[in-house]
Amino acid sequence: DRLRSRGLGDVYKRQLLNDKYNTIKDSEEVIAPVFGIAHVDDNIAYLGIVEEGEARASIECIPNGASVDYNRAYAKFILRKTYTQPTSNNSTAGSLHVYENERSHSNLAVRYVFLSDDNANYTGMAAAYREYLLRSEGLAQNESSFRTRVDFLGTERESFLLGTSSVVMTTVDDIYEIYDELESEGVSDLLTVYKGWQKKGLNSVPITSYKADSKIGGTSKLTKLIKDAGERNIRMYLYNDALRINPDEKNATFNVVKQINKRRFEETTYKTVYSTMNYLTPARTLSLLNSFIGKYVKSGVGNLALAGISNTLFSYTYSGDTYTRYDTQKMYENIVTEAAQKTKLVLEQPFAYLWSDTDAFLDMPLYTSSYIFEDESIPFLSIVLKGVMPMYSEYVNFEANKQEFFLKLVETGVYPSFYITKESSAKLLYTNSSDIYSSEYSTYKDTIVEYYKELKALHEKIADSTVTKHEIVDNDIRIVTYSNGVTVYINYGADAVSVDGVTIESMSYEVR
């Protein structure tokens, strides 16, 4: 629709009530419900924070000239939507466009923060949002020592005769060996998320109990690894996608969400072994996650990396009742809060309403959304959270320009992440992880060591300081100033540049 094409995207995520429109490019997910406009020449700006009703809102941005001669940014609240209702179970039959029976019921509130003088810019907006989160949203300032994130894939499955067979990528013994090698190179502070550790591998979801796949070494051996890692100052977390159920491996007849047109929601994976996934109802997620956590914690460990529910919201129907995004948000918030009380919890790219319950932000995005009317790429989220919460990047493995990506890590203060396997990624060719085209430890060992040493040295100068100023100079130069007085100069250009008496070589950085 015409207005939607100008929007930045829905606050939070998916609306299962509706069939998906075919568009050239989906709107971006909005991780934090904020927006703003700055008149830098006049030293005035505002920040808008959607405080209530954000689960069913979108952030709209319309540049001048599109319809009127003003730049506009605002929150649009959705009260009632239309959906496509098939007239029969026959896919070739007709359909009707039907309105939702009831409009959504929620308070709607936007807080505006007005900024002036030196604060009338995007850094001032980020600082204002940070202050709001610390003061009003229960976010605690818990930035800690630098760590490099090294994740492992345990097992996957590939098709074999009438079923599937195991593809073992990284065992418990392999991880011990990798930790020993990295420690001998001076890499001691690590955070690890172990994926595909459970019986029958990565896509055997949901996880209902604490049972490790025997091919990686079994439950007892995994438990010992987690405990031993902790004694070496390595934080090892087990990965759990609490949202999805694999209908090829688990009974998905009940407890899965349906769209309002009564059709079961199916997420297409575009992979060969398991082509679709379903979503669990939030009530079922609560039941299964509590069951897993109870058995996991009882074993004497409790580091958990939660995915799926951390960055997905939807409306759905179940057993004849309709549940809104507000219902899902409230349920997920309770689930995550309860999990955080029982475990040491980290969340995968969490929405803002869950930030107070996570010890770290996994998969922090570092690049722009690439909208045509964008002028500059601003690392807004990392400016907000730097010095408040440890942030870990998306995987270095899959970045085409690793030199530029490294400088992004320097600019944002985000810690590096690697997705590692002991075996060659060629073994994953016929699995659902076929998109992991480069992961072998021997390929990335030197890079892990290099990133660790250089970025740790930078962190020791910055410590737990927050960003007080972020400047863009002549497109290629970024200047980041921290609250402890340290300034970092980054040069993305092809030529050496001198700024403030500091010479920065091409594709390099300097710290003062």
Give, region by region, the residue ranges found by the protein language model.
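Active-site-proximal substrate-binding groove within the catalytic cores of carbohydrate-active enzymes
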Residues: N18, K25-S27, I31-A73, Q85-S88, ...
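Extended acidic/polar, glycine-enriched regions
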Residues: D10-L139
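Aromatic-lined carbohydrate-binding/catalytic grooves of carbohydrate-active enzymes
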Residues: E143-K227, R232-S287
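Short loop/turn motifs at secondary-structure junctions
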Residues: G7, G186-D189, S299-G300
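Terminal accessory/anchoring regions of large secretory-pathway or extracellular enzymes
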Residues: V113-D151, T155-L191, S434-A457, K461-D464, ...
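Structural preference for beta-strand elements that scaffold enzyme active sites
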Residues: D189-L191, R235-Y237, G302-A305, K344-V346
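Glycine-centered small-residue hotspots that permit tight backbone geometry or close packing
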Residues: G7, D213-S220, G387, V502, ...
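Single conserved hydrophobic/aromatic residue that forms the stacking wall/gate
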Residues: D1-Y12
